């Protein structure tokens, strides 16, 4: 039952919340999609945190999406141990860069008084959720090696089943709890946005 809730109900519920909430926010308050700008309040930490965070996370998310969309090509790519090791090292390095950038952005929001004054509770909730998700990804990369390879055979078929409106949670059942938490956390982030 829990697997059905986690891997068949929560993903659809998260997407529904994101779509309906997005429409509602657009109609009621179009400017609520972003935290208040703090660029003029303190920009040095913003630059280093923002650049590290955005470059790191966009490349990590890009790899997740490429493996999802081009799964056969990705499986072929990571079938060679040298390419697999290279992708794993690059992915871990990028996730560490993203995490450090996000940590800098969170610290800036908490420490710089003028920035803290324009920080809403929802800003902090989202930043903590993002940091948790990236930390889980790093934990998986360090503790459950070769994720670039097994992702294609577990999470990708599960995500494809969701898109086809025929959820197959059995693909996720045998994965470690931390991987399951990372997968569900991704959909919770979708709902938060």
Region annotations inferred by a language model:
Residues 11-15, 21-22, 37-193:
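Membrane-embedded alpha-helical bundles of multi-pass integral membrane proteins
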């Amino acid at each position: 039952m829990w697997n059905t809730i986690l891997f068949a109900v929560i993903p659809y519920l998260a997407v529904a919340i994101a779509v309906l909430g997005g429409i509602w926010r657009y109609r009621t308050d179009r400017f609520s999609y972003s935290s208040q700008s703090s660029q003029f309040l303190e920009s040095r930490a913003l630059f280093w945190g923002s650049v590290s965070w955005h470059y790191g996370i966009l490349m990590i998310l890009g790899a997740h999406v490429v493996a999802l969309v081009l799964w056969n090509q990705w499986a072929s790519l990571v079938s060679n141990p040298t390419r697999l090791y290279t992708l794993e090292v690059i992915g871990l390095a990028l996730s560490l860069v993203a995490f450090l950038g996000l940590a800098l952005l969170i610290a800036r929001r908490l420490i710089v008084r003028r920035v803290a004054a324009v920080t809403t509770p929802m800003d902090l909730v989202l930043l903590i959720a993002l940091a948790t998700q990236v930390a889980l990804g790093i934990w998986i990369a360090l503790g459950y090696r070769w994720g670039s390879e097994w992702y294609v055979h577990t999470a990708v078929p599960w995500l494809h089943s969701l898109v086809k409106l025929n959820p197959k949670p059995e693909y996720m059942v045998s994965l470690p709890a931390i991987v399951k938490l990372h997968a569900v956390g991704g959909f919770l982030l979708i709902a938060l946005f």
